[in-house]
């Protein structure tokens, strides 16, 4: 068998054919060179042998689409590579349509760049010219705005007054030298002086009313700012109280949720314990039923044993009767043997043999029947016990699976609760962080607003100081220019240069734009000193002042 298995053909022949004698000799080398293609314990009669050409045809048929697709991809790749090489070769040619088009585009691009450069130069020159115009306009506007300020206007009024006074004194001197006792001229001059004094007084009162109105407006604005600050503080306090209330409500809600979760957990635990208790009760009932079934089985087996014992006793009785009958027949036959002839002895022996064979047959059938019944009972008992064991095992598996499912559900429930708690803690932390950030942001905004207000005040003070310096420089130049001609009429200019309404000599009010009151004060608080006038002046200088045209 081993020799025939070694001589089996592997390719191109049916199972059972042998190779040539020259190939059979090298069986060991074949085993080394050609490893077995079939698994062990395979019936070679059930194996289909395919010729090499057919196998190759099948492989070609299966791989045809792949080869065709590979060929198509290779052709497309070769065409694409050739196209790219062609494009690379003719890329810099100038005698092609594409080359000429490229040259035209480059020339057009160059012309556009030159035109754009010229336009940029023109735009730059235009921008420089416009910037100069804007700068000049801004300087003119600043100068006009400077001339339109109240102090400059007052200074110009004082300048005009000094020039008027200078001109008036010149005219007075001229008239005095020409007509010294012209009462009509004096009356007219007096009227003019009174009229001028009234006009100046009205202007001064008007300026004073305007300044009072401006001061009231400033006080009103200060009061509005203070009220706005009070409202803002109240709003912030209200926001803080609202945040505290929201936090308290959130904590109450979280406590309620925790209480609800605890109640749900207690309820779930109670249901689980009830379920386990019911399960134990069911298990006890099932165990009781199992015990009842086992008791029934034991009773059945006991009854079956009793029946078997009764059958054995009956069989023993039957055997005893048969032995007794056999003995009786034997005695009867022995008596007949004494009486009959030899042929009769043969007939009797044959009958005895037949009777014994029949009895043995009946006994054998009976034994087989008893054995079959016992075997059936044993098989039934084994099946019942096996079913019971399988049911018990299945019940234990189901109980274990149910317990695992309950434990898994409990674990999932706790994980879910833990996740919900983490999520709630995270939300609470986020809300708390948001509140903290909002409070910090409000503080930062308030601090920024205060800093901005301080910066604004500093910038305002710096601007006021710069404007004051500019005004003082301008006034000094004008006063020096006017003092070159005469020093007699520069007092209105000096008075207009002084700070405060009316050129007061009181303390400087920084919060009121550097105003100086016209009354005497004790300190920088600006409290006016009491005024005591025990007696009036002995001589009234107002008449002389009005006659001379003074307005202060």
Swiss-Prot record:
Pfam families attached to this UniProt entry: TPH
UniProtKB keywords: Cell projection, Cilium, Coiled coil, Cytoplasm, Cytoskeleton, Flagellum
Entry GO terms, CC: axonemal B tubule inner sheath; axonemal microtubule; sperm flagellum
Main subcellular location: cytoplasm
UniProt record, GO biological process: flagellated sperm motility
Tissue: Expressed in airway epithelial cells.
Region (Disordered): 216-238
Coiled-coil segments: 53-143, 186-307, 348-409, 460-488
Tagged with keyword Cytoplasm: yes
InterPro entries in the cross-refs: CFAP210, TPH_dom
Subcellular location: Cytoplasm, Cytoskeleton, Cilium axoneme; Cytoplasm, Cytoskeleton, Flagellum axoneme
PANTHER family referenced in this protein's UniProt entry, alphabetically: CILIA- AND FLAGELLA- ASSOCIATED PROTEIN 210, COILED-COIL DOMAIN-CONTAINING PROTEIN 173
Subunit comment: Microtubule inner protein component of sperm flagellar doublet microtubules.
Task performed by this protein: Microtubule inner protein (MIP) part of the dynein-decorated doublet microtubules (DMTs) in cilia axoneme, which is required for motile cilia beating.
The protein's name in its UniProt record: Cilia- and flagella- associated protein 210
Organism: Homo sapiens
Taxon lineage: Eukaryota, Metazoa, Chordata, Craniata, Vertebrata
